[in-house]
């Protein structure tokens, strides 16, 4: 099933490791086969991984963008997720953590990545950060 991306003017995204930028008009991109695609708004730089939830998100993002080298990021992911789960008491968040781990183990990195965003939202609410 093709993936259809509607792009804003100038919007950047990563496609199989390459940074691509849309032109000066709205555009539509249709991917006919499996590819790693991540929109600019979902891309995190290493120096932005400054909180426990973001330190989970970052290695998951790297696993998604570079599946061939996912094992390099796995140890960091497992350590950070274990630390996070050790201090969180919210059962819904813990359920999300387990689901993220299962997705990573199944190499479903995009699903794990999108669920990891929920951890960041939870953390921001608890810490009073404004997104």
From Swiss-Prot:
<dbReference type="GO" id="GO:0048027">
    <property type="term" value="F:mRNA 5'-UTR binding"/>
</dbReference>
<keyword id="KW-0678">Repressor</keyword>
<protein>
    <recommendedName>
        <fullName>Probable flagellum biosynthesis repressor protein FlbT</fullName>
    </recommendedName>
</protein>
<comment type="similarity">
    <text>Belongs to the FlbT family.</text>
</comment>
<keyword id="KW-0694">RNA-binding</keyword>
<dbReference type="GO" id="GO:0006402">
    <property type="term" value="P:mRNA catabolic process"/>
</dbReference>
<dbReference type="GO" id="GO:1902209">
    <property type="term" value="P:negative regulation of bacterial-type flagellum assembly"/>
</dbReference>
<dbReference type="GO" id="GO:0044781">
    <property type="term" value="P:bacterial-type flagellum organization"/>
</dbReference>
<dbReference type="Pfam" id="PF07378">
    <property type="entry name" value="FlbT"/>
</dbReference>
<keyword id="KW-1005">Bacterial flagellum biogenesis</keyword>
<dbReference type="InterPro" id="IPR009967">
    <property type="entry name" value="Flagellum_FlbT"/>
</dbReference>
<comment type="function">
    <text>Has a post-transcriptional repressor function in flagellum biogenesis. Associates with the 5'-UTR of fljK mRNA and promotes its degradation.</text>
</comment>
């Amino acid at each position: 099933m093709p993936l259809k991306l509607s792009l804003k003017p100038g919007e950047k995204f990563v496609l199989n490791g390459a940074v691509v930028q849309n032109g000066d008009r709205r555009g539509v991109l249709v991917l006919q086969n499996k590819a790693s695609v991540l929109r600019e708004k979902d891309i995190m730089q290493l120096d932005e991984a400054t909180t426990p939830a973001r330190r989970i998100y970052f290695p998951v993002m790297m696993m998604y963008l570079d599946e061939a080298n996912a094992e390099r990021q796995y140890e960091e992911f497992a350590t950070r997720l274990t630390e996070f789960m050790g201090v969180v008491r919210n059962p819904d968040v813990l359920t999300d953590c387990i689901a993220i781990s299962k997705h990573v183990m199944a190499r479903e990195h995009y699903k794990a990545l999108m669920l990891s965003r929920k951890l960041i939202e939870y953390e921001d609410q608890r810490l009073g950060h404004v997104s």
